[in-house]
Design a protein with these regions (language model features):
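OB-fold/S1-family single-stranded nucleic acid-binding modules
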Residues: 34-60, 175
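Short, surface-exposed ligand- or partner-binding patches at beta-edge/loop junctions that are enriched
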Residues: 145-161
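Short acidic/polar inter-strand loop motif in beta-rich domains
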Residues: 35-42, 158-170
Length: 186
């Protein structure tokens, strides 16, 4: 097997995680690894699969039961390699059944180069006892304008979180200024 590091494929010398990924498939993961001194291969120490939700409009059938906005805390959020990446902190009991998605609004894309995104999070009635992290990587390449492929696109991201009193509120913290995505550059 091999892993792609910064657009360079490297054979895996040793996978200490015991993970298995089917042949001829790819998966977006976060990993701790070490490139061998001669640069010929890498040793993988840990792998974490990422949730990769493809943004869909509010009227998509996947949202037929409504837009769920159970609260999360954003630990970290950044642009990287044509993705909006984030680490979220969830309050969970079992941690099972949480569903994530991205609701997109592209009504301002052609005119102003803006994509509005809202985090869909259905905790599926999981009780809020413990902290657990979720790693999400939202693909952005579908917003590239074929006529102007280098055009910068402003990504505005909203999500539901907790206010200082512990009540759920929608945060627009990442809307002004948002994230300036330049295809192929960040």
């Amino acid at each position: 097997s091999e892993m792609c590091i910064r657009d360079r494929a490297l054979p895996v010398a040793e996978d200490r995680t015991g993970s298995t990924i089917a042949a001829n498939t790819s998966r977006r993961v976060m990993s701790n690894y070490e490139v061998l001194p001669d640069g010929s291969a890498a040793t993988i120490y840990s792998l974490q699969s990422l949730i990769v939700p493809v943004p869909k409009p509010e009227d998509d059938p996947v949202y037929k039961d409504g837009i769920k906005q159970d609260p999360v805390e954003v630990v970290s959020i950044w642009l990287g390699r044509d993705y909006l990446n984030m680490i979220l902190n969830l309050k969970v009991s079992t941690g099972k059944g949480h569903t994530f998605g991205i609701v997109e609004d592209v009504s301002e894309l052609k005119t102003n180069g803006i994509v509005n995104m809202l985090l869909y999070h259905d905790a599926n009635s999981d009780e809020e006892y413990y902290n657990r992290r979720a790693y999400i990587s939202v693909p952005l390449a579908q917003y590239i304008d074929e006529e102007h492929p280098g055009r910068t696109i402003n990504i505005k991201f909203k999500y539901c979180t907790y206010d200082k009193d512990g009540s759920a509120v929608v945060s627009e913290k990442y809307c002004d200024p948002g994230f300036d995505y330049t295809p192929g550059q960040n």
